[in-house]
């Protein structure tokens, strides 16, 4: 849909999704969980033009599944993903990535992933 003159192009104004009820993460995050978060951050950082949004969503969803399993807390999962997203190069200068939009995308995808907990996280 093409926005009209009266519609805002400011993607940062989108309301944030509600935070899901999630299990408490362990006091110490398992090294394998941290490796998976680092891998997601790396994938986001290296995402090429045309694949950035999909890469951000896929990585955040995958980490969200670990959040849902209780392997990592919501904030510990979202923070590095958001930082990687904000650092993405904006290939389209007319639509630069904004912190608010990245935060919205990450929280939404992590929340959706948390609704489908990763069964492998139970053995971490």
State the predicted function of each range.
Residues 1-124:
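Modules that initiate DNA replication and primer synthesis
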């Amino acid at each position: 849909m093409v926005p009209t003159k009266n519609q805002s192009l400011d993607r940062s104004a989108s309301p944030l999704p509600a935070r899901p009820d999630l299990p408490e993460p362990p006091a110490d995050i398992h090294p394998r969980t941290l490796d998976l978060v680092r891998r997601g951050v790396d994938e986001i950082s290296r995402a090429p033009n045309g694949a950035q949004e999909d890469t951000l969503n896929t990585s955040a969803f995958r980490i969200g599944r670990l959040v849902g399993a209780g392997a990592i807390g919501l904030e510990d999962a979202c923070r590095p993903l958001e930082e990687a997203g904000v650092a993405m190069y904006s290939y389209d200068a007319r639509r630069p990535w904004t912190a608010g939009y990245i935060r919205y995308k990450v929280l939404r995808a992590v929340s959706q992933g948390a609704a489908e907990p990763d069964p492998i996280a139970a053995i971490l």
